[in-house]
Amino acid sequence: MMKESSKWIAAFVEIIIENGDWTETDRYYLTNRIAKLVGCDFFEQPEAVACEQEPLRVVEHLLNIAQANHQIDDSITEAEQLEAELMDFITPTPTIINQKFMDYYQESPRKATDYFYQLCKTNNYIKTKAIAKNIIFPMDSPYGKLEITINLSKPEKDARKILAEKKMSQKKYPACMLCMENEGYYGRVNYPARTNHRIIRLNLEDEAWGFQYSPYAYYNEHAIFLDQQHREMKIEKKTFQRLLKITELFPEYFVGSNADLPIVGGSILSHDHYQAGRHTFPMDLAPMEKRFSLKKYPEITAGILKWPMSVIRLQSDRQEELVEAAELILTKWRNYSDERVSVRAYSKDGTPHHTITPIARRKGSLFELDLVLRDNNVSEEFPDGIFHPHPEVQHIKQENIGLIEVMGLAILPPRLAQELREVEKYLLKQPNQIAESHRAWADELSQQTITEANVKEVIQQGIGTIFVQILTDAGVFKRDEEGRRAFERFIQCIEND
């Protein structure tokens, strides 16, 4: 055991010196520090250092050693805390990372993001092994090829829990998962270890913001921009200014914000933040099916997207005009009601119900803003939300429809992985334990010709069809004739203003 422990300690020290800001002078120091962390009070330099160069694989061996030495128990929490502490040795300090990032940025934004992204994968802040477990498949639809993900790397939240967390978050340290004080935080039960976490500091419109990657990425280079202050999500003029500024700083990234109201917002409403990345979403490729003009801003190209949700696209090479036009549409939408299609801006008590999910990107020399109209009204028929996944599709997805799904990438809950295996057995008429919530849907699917060769494809296509319905449910102005006329009435309100 002693030789085995020494072998992996020596291997990790080798990786630290090669990947971190340490030198040969630090070898004894590092050896003793690592040995202590894994519970070894003796070290014997191996004749040959293990050639394994993948940090995570070596750290997994060290975690096994630590558990055998009773340094940690068999809980996930203690293992993750020690893993993050070990990975911190190959992670430069915040000062050094920020300096290196800026040095690379002087060469190009791409070199800077490549450096930071690779570092966050190497030190396992980005959970590549967990992310690889996700089930991903494309699905053809009337709106192009949509993306479906069954998320096996991160637990799901329901809308009520999200709202409860918003109310409770002020009494915690860190105040929430996005606060900058997470950088280097050791973690605790029910709160993740962040010892190896780093944040790039940015100035956005004369405000201090941070840039980091998501540990549970849903797409390529899934990034987060976060306010240094812990303040609630708010869609306003400054939101559009910041989003467009980010696309100027990082022209290869899209960036968008979740809505700032419950039901139609994301999983964290208590801290202003945006999500970004190097990924082309299905909505990016959606065409404008009806163009219109804005009297005040004749240079802006504007139109309604061919998309199941209600989306206005604006394009221009002038950031300031785009910001002003977006603010005009936001203001109009916040105060717009149309009882004919159950669209109500305010409750009788003055509670606001309208907001926007905005997305910004670059298209060559043009800046592009997509403004997705959102409404979080509820009713007796739809207590979870009128423009929220309706009961008949909640066996697949009952959570909020946030920014990522708005753009055509479904993030479905982990429970489906096992439940769909039972649906598969049911369709093949094999012994099964199908969830009652899926039975009616499975009976519909069974009307097709089902074989062992095509059953997975049939189920996936069925999920894709439901995802389109989910987006349609979340759309304020429906895709039928009544909905189109209602959307045009709203457009008329902003065209001549």
UniProtKB/Swiss-Prot annotation:
Its EC number is 2.7.7.12. It is an enzyme of class 2 (transferase). Coiled coil: none annotated. One of its GO terms (molecular function) is UDP-glucose:hexose-1-phosphate uridylyltransferase activity. Its main location: cytoplasm. Pfam families: GalP_UDP_tr_C, GalP_UDP_transf. Pathway: Carbohydrate metabolism; galactose metabolism. It is found in: Cytoplasm. Keywords: Carbohydrate metabolism, Cytoplasm, Galactose metabolism, Nucleotidyltransferase, Transferase. It catalyses: alpha-D-galactose 1-phosphate + UDP-alpha-D-glucose = alpha-D-glucose 1-phosphate + UDP-alpha-D-galactose. GO terms for biological process: galactose metabolic process. GO terms for cellular component: cytoplasm. Belongs to the galactose-1-phosphate uridylyltransferase type 2 family. This is Galactose-1-phosphate uridylyltransferase. The lineage of its organism: Bacteria, Bacillati, Bacillota, Bacilli, Lactobacillales. The gene is galT.
